[in-house]
Amino acid sequence: SKWFEYNELHKKHVLKIDVSFPIGQSEITHIPLEKREELYSAGLAIDQFLKHAEEEYGESVKYLLIIEGQASNDGYTGNFDLSYQRALSLYRYFQINRHLDLKRQNCEVLVCGSGTEGALRAYPDNASNTKNQRFLIHILPKPGIIN
């Protein structure tokens, strides 16, 4: 896919667009317009994927769409809140600015912030690496009944 790649280690599709926020910022307007347009295109790709899956499989296949904000490992005590605000900013951008609602019968949307935690961190994971001032989009199939 142009916008997503499958991460074999973590078993999930992950956004490929390189987006990062300035230090301490969470508003989508702090991301360059060109990157916001790419994010919108990725959102449209998600929407098309979900529509196709719904038409093809009906209720038998469900997905979990996670918009995860992250923060750099700089010791700031508000990193969890900041990372959540980054994810929420993208979700609102899709819904309000672009009228793109990714909630469907076959998809649950979660908006979360992992602060300085999470499995897919940019390395080295230190205070000077601002690449973790970003968000990730994960698309996961939901399993059936677990016995």
What is the predicted role of each segment?
Residues S1-E5:
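Long, contiguous juxta-domain segments that are non-catalytic but functionally important
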Residues Y6, H52, A122:
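Sparse, context-dependent recognition of short Cys/His-centered cofactor- or disulfide-binding micro-motifs
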Residues N7-A45, A71-T77:
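Short, solvent-exposed beta-strand/turn patches at coil↔beta or beta↔helix junctions
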Residues E27-I66, Q95, I137, G144-N147:
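Periplasmic peptidoglycan-binding/anchoring modules of Gram-negative envelope and division proteins
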